[in-house]
Amino acid sequence: MKKIIIVSIAKEKKIKDFRLVITPSGRSRIGAIQTKDYGIIAYPDKKDFEKIGEMINWAFNESDDKVIEYSSDIKIEKRFYNCNSYRKVTNDYNMIFFELIEGIYSISLLKKDGDAFVALEDENKEAVECIFPEKPTALELGTKVMEMFEYKERYDGLIE
């Protein structure tokens, strides 16, 4: 099995006083990537790039390939987002994945597609992502993640 680590980073679609939800991952019993039952819910200053990067790095360090033996019965949309359906999460949040796949670190910007998130493509039909030559510092990671969220907010017309 390939070594794959994924950290989910969700930002509420608000310019001020937004919620940031950062969750580590493990494996389900059948080997699929699964969100762990804990994470970070924060209301950071959007310019505090290093602190945002540190929170993402914490979740990255918590992520692994171990099987999650005991999982909460509380649905993820209620547990982390205080929403009553995952559709509300896809409507109210933008999502980025920070990934490590076979030694390559990258972040991928996602978009809503029905009731799920899929890779966002730019005007050239290329995925909006950033590949790092090595593990990024907290400052680099936080800066790039917030730049990508800003790009998505412009794409959605939330900011000009």
Regions found by a protein language model. Give the residues of each.
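Negatively charged, low-complexity tracts enriched in Asp/Glu with abundant Ser/Thr
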Residues: 42-94
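Short, solvent-exposed interaction modules
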Residues: 73-118, 122
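Intrinsically disordered, low-complexity regulatory segments enriched in Ser/Thr/Pro
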Residues: 1-47, 101-143
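Arginine residue identity/basic-tract feature
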Residues: 19, 27-29, 79, 87, ...
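Ampiphathic alpha-helical segments that act as solvent-exposed interaction surfaces
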Residues: 43-66, 124-160
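Generic signature of intrinsically disordered, low-complexity segments enriched in small/polar residues
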Residues: 21, 89, 96, 108, ...
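Phenylalanine-focused residue identity feature
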Residues: 18, 49, 60, 80, ...
